[in-house]
Each structure stands twice: as C-alpha cells, then as structure tokens.
Amino acid sequence: MAATPYGKVSTPEAYDFACFEGALRERIGDAFDVLQSAQVTIMGCGGLGSNIAVFLARCGVGHLHLIDFDHVEASNLNRQQYRVCDLGRPKTEALADLLHSINPFIDTKADQVEVTDDNLRDLLEGADVICEAFDSPAAKAMLVNGARLHFPEVPLVSGIGMAGNGPANVIRTRRISRNFWVCGDGVTDVNVVGTLFAPRVAVCAAHQATIIMRLLLGLADEKLDG
C-alpha cells in the first residue's frame, strides 16, 4: 500500500484497510463488518466516556452516540480526552471532533442533553450496546433501571469504582445479571476518596471498552467475563 500523505487519508476504504480491516479480517474473519455496522450509545462523556469513545473509535466501531449535558472545564483536563482548546465547548461536540480527527469516516451523533426518565427511552433507541459512564450515583441508578426496563435485551455496561490511586489490578469486569456487566473495583467512590487519576480511570474505561467489543463480536463468555 502506498504511503499516505501527511495529515490526509484519501478514502474511507484506504483508512479502513490501513487501520482495521487487514488485521481484523486475518484474525477474526468478519469482525470488521460487525464493528463497522454496530452502534454504541455512551451516556456520559467525562473521564470514562471520553476514553471509552476513543478506544472504540480506534477499534473500528462505526457508530457512536454521545450523550452529555456538560461543557469542558479546566478540571476535566487531568483525566478526560479533552484539550485546552476545548475549554467551554460542549463535551459531546468536542469529543465528536476528536473522534473524527482519529477516524474521519466514523458516524457520530451528539446529544447535549441532561438524561431524565422522560427522555431516556428515546435516547437509547437503536443501541446495540448501552454504555453507562455517568459521575452521579443517582444518574447511574436511573440509567440502569431504565435500560433494564425499556431494553432488557440490549447489553448494558456500567463503570463503578475507579477513584483514588489504588492498585489497577483490583479493577475487574463482572457480569451482574443477564445482559448487565459492571467494570471497576466496586468500592472507591470519588465522593469518599476525593480524587480521580487518569491512569486508573483509563483502566476502568479500557475494561468497559473491552467487554463492549467482546459483546459486539459475540465473544463474551460467562466464565471469562465475570
């Protein structure tokens, strides 16, 4: 394959082959097509959600629905995938731009809204996997309850317990019930520990992105994945 000019990718096909298709087809057969057609809805675009979105974009997931009501603040820069030039922008907008800088041909939908019981069902419509990445325990509970009520057949992946600077190896992926996985140490709450560090948040986000990928590819295993 010819060298790519600096800062340019000529076609979607060239990008897909260079980044994903050759390796994925060789290793997992039709996985590339599965990932390209998949939609993951990410609820919350902070430390977990922004990292998860970047991981999935780099793995070739074709459709990402980004949902968050907030704007980028300076306090976000220590652990979230935003830059100084993003300060003041809606997180969904800034994250979508970042994803398109990684993969110009990814399909993103950005909703800058606060998730409530009233709009939850409409926001989750069409998702192949639902990813919970909220900060607030109340918002997490509302999403989990609503998703299990309205879309019990859609896998839900949640993150709980990644605060502080404890060991990374206690962060795990656990299958809580049918179609419901939780990633984290299940203990460390930022309201108790008081700090969030980029490496530990990213470890939890990587766990979430990994089980999402395994679910999309039909590889999730009850014994191996909690």
What annotation goes with each model-predicted range?
Residues 48-49:
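Hydrophobic/small residue at the entry helix of a nucleotide-binding pocket
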